[in-house]
Amino acid sequence: MSLLKEFKEFAVKGNVLDLAVAVVIGAAFGKIVSSLVADVIMPIIGLIFGNTDFASSWAYKGIKYGVFIQSIVDFLIVAGAIFLFIKLINKITRKSEVEEVEEAVEENTVLLTEIRDLLRSK
């Protein structure tokens, strides 16, 4: 098998395409969360502490712990959103898996009943 053909099969697999879409959406979502934290949440926190520019004003001798705190808030929001999204997806997929199993069990029961009836008739 040629290298190009192998790469084509690899790149067209569903998992690779799903990963590519996830990376693009994740990058866009990261920008939204960064804006939410920088433009909405941190100014509110800054007002509580008496300053509206929390990230740049909270520094000590070049150590910008305000920016670090802002990054932690970014991370917590992203992690929470991803957790809720994955939880929702798992709930949806579990329901469909249960339905598939129930359908398979019903189909197997029908087939076994037919086989039993055929064996009885012999």
UniProtKB/Swiss-Prot annotation:
Belongs to the MscL family. GO terms for molecular function: mechanosensitive monoatomic ion channel activity. Homopentamer. Channel that opens in response to stretch forces in the membrane lipid bilayer. May participate in the regulation of osmotic pressure changes within the cell. This is Large-conductance mechanosensitive channel. GO terms for cellular component: plasma membrane. It is a multi-pass membrane protein. Gene3D superfamilies: Large-conductance mechanosensitive channel, MscL, domain 1 (1.10.1200.120). It comes from the Bacteria. It comes from Macrococcus caseolyticus (strain JCSC5402) (Macrococcoides caseolyticum). HAMAP family: MscL. The chain crosses the membrane at residues 29-49, 66-86.
